[in-house]
Structures are given as C-alpha cells and as structure tokens.
Amino acid sequence: MSIKLKQRFVPQLAAINCQFEEDFAQMLKTVDTSHIKEKTVVKGQVIEIKNDMIIVDVGLKNEGRIPKSEFLSLPEVGDVVEVFIEKIEGRNGRTILSREKAVKEELWGQLEIMCSKGEFVDGTIFGRVKGGFTVDLSGVVAFLPGSQVDVRPIKDPTSIMNIKQPFKILSMDKKLGNIVVSRRVILEESRSEARDEMLSKIKEGIVLEGVVKNITDYGAFIDLGSVDGLLHLTDISWGRVNHPSEVLEFNQKVKVMVIKFDEKTKRISLGIKQLDSNPWDAIKEEFPVGKKMTGKVTNFADYGVFLELKDGLEGLVHSSEISWLKSNQNPRKMLTIGQEVEFIVLEVDTEKHRVSLSIKQCQENPLIKFAENNPIGTIIKAPIRNITDFGIFVVLGNNMDGMIHEGDISWEDNGTDLLKSYKKGDEIECKVLAINFEKEQVSLGIKQLLPNPYQKISDEYKKSTIVKAVVTEIKDDGLVVLLNNKVTGFIKRVELSDEKDEQKPEMFKVHEEIDAKVVSIEKSTGRVLLSIKAHKIAERQKTLKEYGSSDNTTNMGDILANVLEEKK
C-alpha cells in the first residue's frame, strides 16, 4: 500500500514532471532547503486563494499567506511568484511572506545597477515633504531635494507633479532605505547643448517668441526655449506700468526684441515696447508747451496725479500745480479717477519721458485778485477758520486763508496766551502785512492796527548812543537797568567788560550808575540792549587817536592813566 504525500513546491523541481508520487517523494528527500533564508527573495507557488489572502508555498514545511492588496494583478492557483521571506516560522507556525517587499527588492537591485551606470530612471513626483518632494520610482519612494527640482525656482510646483519624467539617482543607502534623486541635473544636461546653440544665434535687434516664466517687481523672465531673458519693467511699454502683472501673466506667450546681449555674462535683455515706434519722438509737436488741453485722471501718487494724454501716454500734475491755494492737500481729496480736467503743458522731457502739466494755471490766481483789492496796509475783517499753537488762520474767500502769527497779535502782551481768548468762527479785524505769491501766503496782523508803542524808544535811543543807566536787578546772565527812570534796558554778561575775568554781574551793585553803549532795541518788547564792553573799547580807540602822535618815549599806560584821572 502506497502512502499519499502532499506535493511540496520546490523551485529546483518545479520544471520536472513526476508521474509517480513515490518518485517525487524520493526526489524531495535529496533537495536541500538550507539556502532558503529570512530577508531574501525566493520563488513560490500559489496553492490556494482564500478570501482576501493568497496562499503561497515556497518549499518550506509551512505555507505563507500574502494579502491580495500586495499584488498589482492577482495570480491564479499554480502560478509561480517571487516573494520576500519575512520569517520562516511566525507565531502561528506559518511562514510570513511579502509580495510587496519582493517587488521592492527586485526594483532596488535594478536601481542600484542604473545608479552605478549613471542611467536615468523614470519616476513621478507625488507629494511634498520638508525640504523637497517624494518621488515614486515604480514602487520605490525616493527623495527629491528642493535644490534639485529645477535650474530656477519654480513658482507653482503642482505643474511638475503627477507627471512621469526622468530623474538621476544621486545616492542610495539600502540599509536606511534612502534614495536621493535629481531632476535639475537632467535639465542642466539637456539645456546645455540647446543653450549653446541658442546663444550662438542671439543678436541685438532680433525678434523672438517666448513664454513668461516668472514675474517679479522689477520685470519678468522670459523663457526663449533653452535660455531665459529679462524683460525689465521699463521696457514693457512706452506708457507707465506700475507692476509687470498689470500687462503680463504666467505662461503667457509674448513677442520680444533682444535689446542687449552681454557675450561675457550671457545675459539677455529683452523689450516689448521696442517693437513699436517711440511715441516720444513726436511728443513735443503733439503737446507743445503752453497748450491748453483736457485729459482724464488715471492714477494718484503721493507727489501728484497722472492724466492720460493719449493711449499709452500720461503726464504728471505735481501736487503744487493742482490748486493755487491747496498745494499741500492730498490729490485724492480734490480729484477722482476718471474725472476729466483741463490742463496746460508746462514741460516735455523726451529723454526722461516725462510730461509736466498744470491744472491750476488754467485758472486765474485768486491771490492776484486779492492783492489788487487789498494792497499791503489794508484793514480787513475775516472769520477765524482755525487756531494753532503758532497763530490764527482766517478765511479770505475763494478757498484762501490768511495767517496771523502769534507775535503779531499784541505789542505788549504774550501772543501765545492771547490765542486762548479767540475761538473758531469769530470775525476779527486785521491788517494785510505781506503777500507772498511764490509761497501763496497772506500774512496778517492785529497789533499793527495800533501804533507801535516802542517806536518812540527807538527814536530816542539810537544805536551806538552812549547813555547813563541805573542797575535795578542783578541776574546770572546779566544786568537789568533803567534809563531815565522809565525805559528798561539789559546788559548781557559778555557785554559787561572786555576782560573775561570781569564779566561777572555780581561785581555790580543795585542803584549803581553806569555808562553803556546802545546795541539794539527789541522790537517786540521795547527793551534796550546795552554794552559796557563796546563803550570801553570805543573810549580806548578815541584816546589812542587823540594821543597817538605824542612823544614816543611816553608810556602808553601813563597816557591812559592820565586820561582816566582827568575824567574822575
């Protein structure tokens, strides 16, 4: 009686067709399975498919189970497949196998060969990680550093994701399971030859077609195929362009002219506006200085407003040329975008591509009319518009203001204190003091309505006059004195003597009478400023002049001593 044996799968015997079980059993005894080790790839036979598991026999005592999910295409019973042996005998006695790891082992080996030969591998970028991207190399995940993505920074990485493309393996570490790849190396190699060929054809003046590759604040980079060129902001249009994104967009096809090519640095400068004739060539004839025209407000700036002269051409109205009397006001508060206004051409600079315009010069200067009706010295009445720390602003009509400085409120009292006695809306009487057409200012005064009480003092105490004064107060910075018992004077410390060590106020006494020279009169207070030093210097010069022709043997000190003695 023969014994029925289970036919165990043995790779070495898989191709042998045994007719008798006894023969198979005998041959099985001679097969050595010691070469089958853990963490290796071996061949096995599918012996059963049960639910979601594939049962595989690799020639060991026990079969192994592999989830169906590990197979890209499901095998059939009897098929021979390569599997990875995780463990020869697991907890439940079964052999632990993996189809997925077997595939990866096979791929890893192929990748190692390609890496050693420097061959490119196909892969797909499918995810982003810190510092770069993940790439699927037909089942093996590799790392693509951000620096190895492209020859230039990519603004939109999604444009290169989920697309099968070639990569070069930079390094492999099987122990750690790490693979680092590069896309940039391939691009550099492929672009190098094409770049050299393209650069050999580049000449200033030729027209090319390109694609907007990147947009910056200062311009746009245009991909000309294998080389890039810079389209500067100022070379996009003859008109004003604030930012390239106003007229260009990513991946837009454009026609450009090579306006400069540096053969040493290989830098290419491009232009779009150069494809058209320069509108500035005939601008002076079209917009002569002094011509009155109309245009629409197109844009505002901190320093003025831009008006459209014609398509693609604008002129600037400086803030000071918008209104006669509101030169410091924000242009946005006086005009609106799209508003049509009348202007006069002031200047055309074809080299700098600038046209200066004026809105206010289309109108009569209201200050001229005011000056005709109110010459200097005219007394007017005007309501208070505003009060500040330094004076009062009053309404003169036609959006004009006049200013009364705090120093022009009163001859005697403190102007800053008097400001508190006025309020907005009060109508006050004042005199026109000055009209400055250049600064567009009208200066007014209240105290000028009355005679200057200090004028009499100025008439009585002329500059350089020698006067007698009595010390009434001693201060650290000088002496307060009284002239003729009615007018206050002051002598600064430095004016007390021509000798520095005698410039001490404490050397004088209250009620002491002194001689001094009038230096000046403070118009705001009527205080007379005096100098003892100037008086002494004048006396010395006078003495030298009188006695300068004396006997040369006479000592000058003796002369001065005698003069001083005579004056006692």
Curated annotation (Swiss-Prot):
<feature type="domain" description="S1 motif 4">
    <location>
        <begin position="290"/>
        <end position="360"/>
    </location>
</feature>
<keyword id="KW-0687">Ribonucleoprotein</keyword>
<dbReference type="GO" id="GO:0003735">
    <property type="term" value="F:structural constituent of ribosome"/>
</dbReference>
<feature type="domain" description="S1 motif 2">
    <location>
        <begin position="118"/>
        <end position="184"/>
    </location>
</feature>
<comment type="similarity">
    <text>Belongs to the bacterial ribosomal protein bS1 family.</text>
</comment>
<feature type="domain" description="S1 motif 3">
    <location>
        <begin position="205"/>
        <end position="273"/>
    </location>
</feature>
<dbReference type="GO" id="GO:0022627">
    <property type="term" value="C:cytosolic small ribosomal subunit"/>
</dbReference>
<dbReference type="InterPro" id="IPR035104">
    <property type="entry name" value="Ribosomal_protein_S1-like"/>
</dbReference>
<dbReference type="InterPro" id="IPR003029">
    <property type="entry name" value="S1_domain"/>
</dbReference>
<dbReference type="Pfam" id="PF00575">
    <property type="entry name" value="S1"/>
</dbReference>
<keyword id="KW-0694">RNA-binding</keyword>
<keyword id="KW-0689">Ribosomal protein</keyword>
<feature type="domain" description="S1 motif 6">
    <location>
        <begin position="464"/>
        <end position="533"/>
    </location>
</feature>
<dbReference type="GO" id="GO:0003729">
    <property type="term" value="F:mRNA binding"/>
</dbReference>
<comment type="function">
    <text>Binds mRNA; thus facilitating recognition of the initiation point. It is needed to translate mRNA with a short Shine-Dalgarno (SD) purine-rich sequence.</text>
</comment>
<keyword id="KW-0677">Repeat</keyword>
<protein>
    <recommendedName>
        <fullName>Small ribosomal subunit protein bS1</fullName>
    </recommendedName>
</protein>
<dbReference type="InterPro" id="IPR012340">
    <property type="entry name" value="NA-bd_OB-fold"/>
</dbReference>
<feature type="domain" description="S1 motif 1">
    <location>
        <begin position="39"/>
        <end position="100"/>
    </location>
</feature>
<dbReference type="InterPro" id="IPR050437">
    <property type="entry name" value="Ribos_protein_bS1-like"/>
</dbReference>
<dbReference type="InterPro" id="IPR000110">
    <property type="entry name" value="Ribosomal_bS1"/>
</dbReference>
<feature type="domain" description="S1 motif 5">
    <location>
        <begin position="377"/>
        <end position="447"/>
    </location>
</feature>
<dbReference type="GO" id="GO:0006412">
    <property type="term" value="P:translation"/>
</dbReference>
